[in-house]
Amino acid sequence: MTASTVYVDVDGTLVGPGGDVLAGDGPRLIGALLGCRAAGIAVVPVTGRSRIQVRELCRLLGLPRGIAELGCIHLEGREVRYELGAFPFLGETPVERMLRDGVLDVVLAQGLEPHEPWNEGREATYLLRGKVDEAAVSARLAAAGHSWCEVVDNGVLRRGGHVYHLAPTGTGKAHGVRVDRRHHGIARADTVYIGDAASDLACADDVGECWLVGNAEPELDWPNRTTGAHGDGVAEVLEQLLA
């Protein structure tokens, strides 16, 4: 297995419970990240986290760039690029529009609740939690005149239920990976993706090889699954690339 770029989910994959990057065998993960840096392999976080969170993560771990808010925000050094899909409005962020135009009221009426405190500082997607049929909720949004946004399932919460993003239609992790590959001229075959949820498997067609870490949702049927959980699983894949 070879690759010049490794896309990696953050929560539940790169970091363990509580956002702990040293969960499990922390030195092993740090060693693998250092090995990738020395070998010129770019490790790129792809996450639902906000722009500020991803910028700080990249700075702390020495990562070259990152993809925030489920593919909507691309960061590289001081450069920030917004990829907002079907969002049609100027002069405001998608989240500002969601809050101002009653979009949030539609989804809250379907049994979801804000996933606080994690909405602070968000620009493109709004975090919700609960358990719904996301396609049905997205259809309700379209019927209410808000077809520019949709509900996206981003995985299972430790305490039960799912976390969802209210996001511009046409965005998502897979779209973020495609945009990053195109921007940097990276061939599909030269990439690997590591994640733990269905939203990560959605990226499989856009990379050369896709892996789930050992703690990934058990109902996900996928042949490439690491033995280790969280960062140990990430290190397992990176070590194969470095061998």
Regions found by a protein language model. Name each.
Residues 8, 68, 195-196:
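Active-site flanking residues adjacent to catalytic metal/cofactor-binding acidic residues
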Residues 1-3, 40, 63, 123, ...:
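A general structural motif
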Residues 2, 26, 167, 174-243:
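Mg2+-dependent phosphoryl-transfer enzymes with acidic/Ser/Thr/Gly-rich catalytic loops
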Residues 2-22, 45, 204:
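Asp-based phosphoryl-transfer active-site loop
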Residues 24-118:
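Active-site phosphate-binding/coordination module
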Residues 19-20, 55-59, 79-80, 139, ...:
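Short amphipathic alpha-helical segments
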Residues 42-44, 125, 192, 211:
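A structural signal for isolated positions on well-ordered beta-strands in alpha/beta enzyme cores
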Residues 106-206:
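Conserved acidic, metal-coordinating active-site core of Asp-based
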